[in-house]
Amino acid sequence: MAQTPAFNKPKVELHVHLDGAIKPETILYFGKKRGIALPADTVEELRNIIGMDKPLSLPGFLAKFDYYMPVIAGCREAIKRIAYEFVEMKAKEGVVYVEVRYSPHLLANSKVDPMPWNQTEGDVTPDDVVDLVNQGLQEGEQAFGIKVRSILCCMRHQPSWSLEVLELCKKYNQKTVVAMDLAGDETIEGSSLFPGHVEAYEGAVKNGIHRTVHAGEVGSPEVVREAVDILKTERVGHGYHTIEDEALYNRLLKENMHFEVCPWSSYLTGAWDPKTTHAVVRFKNDKANYSLNTDDPLIFKSTLDTDYQMTKKDMGFTEEEFKRLNINAAKSSFLPEEEKKELLERLYREYQ
């Protein structure tokens, strides 16, 4: 019997990676169809190899993508399908608005250097990837009746891709794309300051493109400060380690900075040490602006309810707090004002 959801009301999710939210069945299907070897040939085995039950280091977690990304990348049908199925997955979880993020380059096999996942040159460019994801998301919106927008990721280790990400954000602005992100390994020394990233984020500011940055997940508060002061981020992806710098944390509290919190993810990636109190408890107690998110549900074998159950059972979160954080998520979403207002009105109505 399925357990009762911890929060059985409409939810908003702002931090989830498309390439970390693929159905194992779909990976198997395209592995067979494209003749690409996978480490397992049943859904159950594949879920256990790709999935995690206990904490791994961040590199150990990132290695999981190597198993299945070659099966999806460079395949038009697969790229569109994972976007469509993502919307179905979120609709089933009771999400009414979600922002999903991905790197166009990591799903391409043409006009991308270096070539990801040891693929041979094909004909799917980063621009094609965005177009295909948009098609899948928009068809999913029609079929499942929820609203979905997308965020394009720059990668910390590939600053040479970032200006193209900016151009794609401009080209597809409001055609599902609402913002830019910086993802990848934040422990790469000085990566927030790589000229490619800085220039892309400056361009985003100039062009009115919204901005979020992964920072303070496993990195120091300094990475969060760089994200805010240099990259001019409007939201912080994770941000747990911000609380180690009281002055910075208090400043961001005053500025109403939004933290995209992923509790179950932070346990499995080792971003949070379970012997300590989770930063989200501090955020709750300080009435900070934050949301709850899945991050990579395929790898964490989770749904959004996993994160709600964890905070409810282990951290004493209440229904009132769940309402508050979802309203904050809607307020901090990258929707245009009119659509944001509609979303908020819906939440207020359903939360009464």
Curated annotation (Swiss-Prot):
Active site residues of this protein: E217 (proton donor)
Reaction catalysed by this enzyme: adenosine + H2O + H(+) = inosine + NH4(+); 2'-deoxyadenosine + H2O + H(+) = 2'-deoxyinosine + NH4(+); cordycepin + H2O + H(+) = 3'-deoxyinosine + NH4(+)
Record GO biological process: adenosine catabolic process; allantoin metabolic process; alpha-beta T cell differentiation; amide catabolic process; AMP catabolic process; AMP salvage; apoptotic process; B cell proliferation
Expression across tissues: Detected in brain neurons in the median emninence (at protein level). Expressed in secondary deciduum (at protein level). Found in all tissues, occurs in large amounts in T-lymphocytes and, at the time of weaning, in gastrointestinal tissues.
Entry annotated with the keyword Acetylation: yes
GO CC, alphabetical: anchoring junction; cytoplasm; cytoplasmic vesicle lumen; cytosol; external side of plasma membrane; lysosome
Membrane topology of the entry: Peripheral membrane protein
Binding site for substrate: H17, D19, G184, D296
EC number per UniProt: 3.5.4.4
Residue(s) carrying N-acetylalanine: A2
Name recorded for this polypeptide: Adenosine deaminase
